[in-house]
Amino acid sequence: METLISYKNSYSDFKQSYQVQLEHAKGQLKYGIRYGENYRLPLDEKKVVFYLSNNDQRMECLLKVMEAFVKFNLDQEYTIKVIFGAKLDKNLIPKAFQKYIEHPSDAEAQEDLATAQYLLSGESLPKYFVRKEGQNVIRFFDEFHKEENNRLELAQNKLSWLINSTFVFTEDAKSAEYLSDNPYFMELQGKVEQFSEDIIRSKEEIIDHILNRKIEDVKFDKEHILIFVSAWKDEELEERYLRLITDNMNYDQKDVILVMKRPEDGYKEDIVQHLNEHVRIIYRQGTFPCSAAEYIDVQYLLKNFDSFEDVEKAYGHLNTQVIQRETKRLFGDRLFHDVIYIGAHSALWTILAGCVEAKNRLRIQYTDLVIDDQEAITEAKKRAFSNRMELYQLAFDKIVFPNLRYKEQAIEREYVKAEKACYFEFPTKINLENDKKYENISYLGNQYFIGSRFEYEYGGVRLDLFPIPEEGKLKYITNAEICDESELLEMFTKMQEKDSQLVLYGETAAKIRETAKQFGVEDQLLLIEKERLDLSDQMEKYLDSFDGYLYAGNESSYCPIRAGMELLGKDIFVMEDGIIKKDEKKQFKDERSFEEFRMKKWDDFL
């Protein structure tokens, strides 16, 4: 590979340094490279590998199959290997198989995993394993029940291992039913059956039912959506976008997989745990299954994309076969309709997302690129910023901004090409089938009025939703901050005879609602935050849905809600001497005087 950068890091220096590191590599990295060195070798149609990990303490059905191999002398017709966890009791293995045992760390073990036509395993597979085309991977489970396999546990390789399975045997009917019928596992692995000893009554039945089992393609009835969450930088913002996307999918038509690093703390884990129950979660663990030379080439590019002089040329040097082998390790052979990337910059995760086979690849760019550019104060940081923008446009079909302004300034400053940029507003329902158009949604089953669009400095756009009282009831609103609490509640309690609801506006609204429990009307009170309604450019349209405005006490200060209700011709109600009546006094004599005041004090209430 030619040198691609003008900085001190040359490819030859990098390669020499990395070769030394890889020579001393241990654990999964070492085994993954050994496996990768053998990955291109052809499958041996007469090789059978039994893989028992340290977790397979009682895998009776798998052991019975091994015993049957001995009984019918299948070990004389097939090349048999047993990769055996170091912590397992070797007495579990039939004596005739003792001579075939290999330790997972043996070099021969990685070659056998890469070349075996048949791989029979228990609960686990190696983290670096990728099922090759034509390779028959048959799994045996003693139990696989929901209570023992929550989705965070499944995320730790188990889901990927299922995806790389062509057939699954379970020891009990409950597990077979759970894997076959549970929506979380549908369209993942191959066929599932409860293990029956009938299949090992003769040599012919073993060969026909296990060794010569036809590999059936998993049928996909839904469109697959893949979401990448890279390094967590702004947890609140990333969680918001993650929920925005996952809460508004039609899971009758969409199958959603979220892939991410394993959370480093309980807060992030809690975010993931409480996502929509239909979302399948996979933690990327392990390493690239590739040779040492391939690994060095990939790492060189990943670590230097920020400093390359020609990003497009560097991107063209990527060994996409190795990257796609890694995505196959995680997701199997499934094709995705859409790939969505959320989170902070990561060259690795960008490349992974860019190499997944999909119709559409989207990057959610929720930060203000102008600010990001301004914060890049050194020459190296400016190059890194520029290179990242170019890398994103090579890897993704669209860069999605949270508002029109961010999109337009990104195009104007040439951060992003016009044909690569689009935007949506928050919150929305994503319709990936209709040219990335979005529509508003109901929240928790209730209807809300769409309030102001508020742009945060960090790039998010909040679309405020204001509660709408139930149809058929009289609808009132009040400014809770300038009302006498007890008088207001007494007034509203009397109005309950007319079956009404009241929206409370202001910082003290929650306190008043708590007090309302004494009057038994707390369920008829709805709340709006002061900031949200004050900043709304849709306030008058919202107020038009109400029948009247209530106030109690001294309301001498300006109230934009009352002013809006007056100008809309709505009734203003007061209570005097225990009697509720209309108030004919006006805060503004006409609309013009209100507009003049409004323009002068715009920032105070909008």
Residue ranges and their predicted role:
Residues E45-N54, R201, K222-A231, V400, ...:
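Conserved donor-binding/catalytic core segment of Leloir-type glycosyltransferases
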Residues N73-V82, D252-I257, E470, L489-I528:
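A conserved nucleotide-sugar
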Residues P94-E102, L275-Y283, I450, I512-L533:
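Nucleotide-activated donor-binding/catalytic signature segment of Leloir-type glycosyltransferases, i.e.
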Residues H103, R151-Q156, L162, V298-A347:
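Conserved nucleotide-sugar donor-binding subdomain of glycosyltransferases
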Residues K132-N149, A353-D372, V400:
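Active-site proximal beta-strand in glycosyltransferases
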Residues R151-F167, E326-F331, E379-I399, D544:
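Membrane-proximal helix-turn-helix segments that form the acceptor-binding/catalytic region
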Residues V168-M186, A395-K420, T428-Y456:
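A short, active-site helix/loop in glycosyltransferases that binds the activated sugar's phosphate group
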Residues N554:
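Aromatic "clamp/platform" in nucleotide-sugar-dependent glycosyltransferases that forms part
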